[in-house]
């Protein structure tokens, strides 16, 4: 009976560890013309542009896994909010193609919104990591990191 109880406790602890959510990422401060990276729920105050960008999360990842041959590789889609104090946050959905290193191309693609204009600035996606290796659903939501750059329009 004692062994069964110990086994049950260990099994419960193992399941709890696997289902735990990571600690939220701390907000960062950055400036225009500087690439920065956010995780889901994390925000960056763009000091010289006087607004905040928050990555809500990746909503869809259709990139072809690196170890699989695909006919087509799709974009990764994610949601951000932009907020200029004291206003309300405005939500945007962006998409980007990436190479296997997770870097986004510099040029725009027709039908893909990888940049937006906001308050006289351009917010552009620079990369999305990690890149899936074996399956499209192997990356956990909290593992994603999206890199941006903010430039004056």
Predicted regions mapped to residue ranges:
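Sec-dependent signal peptide recognition
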Residues: 2-8
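Acidic, glycine-rich flexible loop segments
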Residues: 107-133
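Bacterial signal peptide processing site
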Residues: 18-20
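C-terminal motif of bacterial Sec signal peptides marking the signal peptidase cleavage site
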Residues: 13-16
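Short, low-complexity, disordered segments immediately C-terminal to signal peptides
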Residues: 22-32
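Mature extracytoplasmic domains of secretory-pathway proteins
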Residues: 62-65, 69-109, 114
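Post-signal-peptide N-terminal segment of Sec-exported extracytoplasmic proteins
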Residues: 36-71
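Short, exposed beta-strand-loop hairpins at the edges of beta-sheets
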Residues: 128-142, 147-149
């Amino acid at each position: 009976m004692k062994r069964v109880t110990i086994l049950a406790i260990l099994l419960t602890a193992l399941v709890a560890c696997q289902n735990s959510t990571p600690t939220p990422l701390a907000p960062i401060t950055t400036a225009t013309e500087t690439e920065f990276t956010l995780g889901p729920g994390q925000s960056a105050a763009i000091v010289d542009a006087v607004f905040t960008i928050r990555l809500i999360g990746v909503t869809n990842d259709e990139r072809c896994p690196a170890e699989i041959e695909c006919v087509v590789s799709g974009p990764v889609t994610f949601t951000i909010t932009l907020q200029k104090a004291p206003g309300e946050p405005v939500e945007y959905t962006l998409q980007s193609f990436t190479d296997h290193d997770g870097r986004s191309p510099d040029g725009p693609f027709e039908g893909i919104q990888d940049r937006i204009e906001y308050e006289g600035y351009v917010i552009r996606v620079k990369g999305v990591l990690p890149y899936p290796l074996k399956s499209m659903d192997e990356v956990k939501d909290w593992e994603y990191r999206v890199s941006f750059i903010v430039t004056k329009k």
